[in-house]
């Protein structure tokens, strides 16, 4: 992994937990910060971040929209912003999860931190680049190969 903490923005608490568990199992210092944590646990995550003990931090877009959180991030070295399930930006952003649209502030707030977006289900119309209007360092859409013709 690169120097600093990578921020992974993920839509679901269960997905965060599964990915953090897998990372920790593989020796990577990963944590999540979401609404399932109490204030003591959140304070512990903040402490670990400030002490540079975290390589991967999983958050929901709602966490990124909190000014206190983004101010804290400015005080630690960041290696990457990774937007997981990036198709949610267009599918959920306008109605169900409006804080996905706040992610478009990443380049202005953190101009020297690379941004990557990952999805397996985006269509051309739901491309994260279209809705974020931000330069992505990497946009990865994985689609199944077409079935062979018989």
Features from the language model and the residues they span:
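Conserved catalytic network of the ASCE P-loop NTPase/AAA+ motor domain
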Residues: 1-2, 23-25, 47-52, 71-76, ...
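Conserved Walker A/P-loop ATP-binding site and its immediately adjacent core
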Residues: 4-28, 32-37, 41, 60-63, ...
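Loop/turn-to-beta-strand initiation segments
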Residues: 4-7, 29, 53-57, 77-80, ...
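Short linear motifs in low-complexity or flexible loops
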Residues: 135-139, 144-148
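Conserved helix/coil segment N-terminal to the catalytic DExD/H
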Residues: 37-80, 88-94
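Post-DEXD/H (motif II) to motif III coupling segment of the RecA-like Helicase ATP-binding lobe
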Residues: 74-75, 79-136
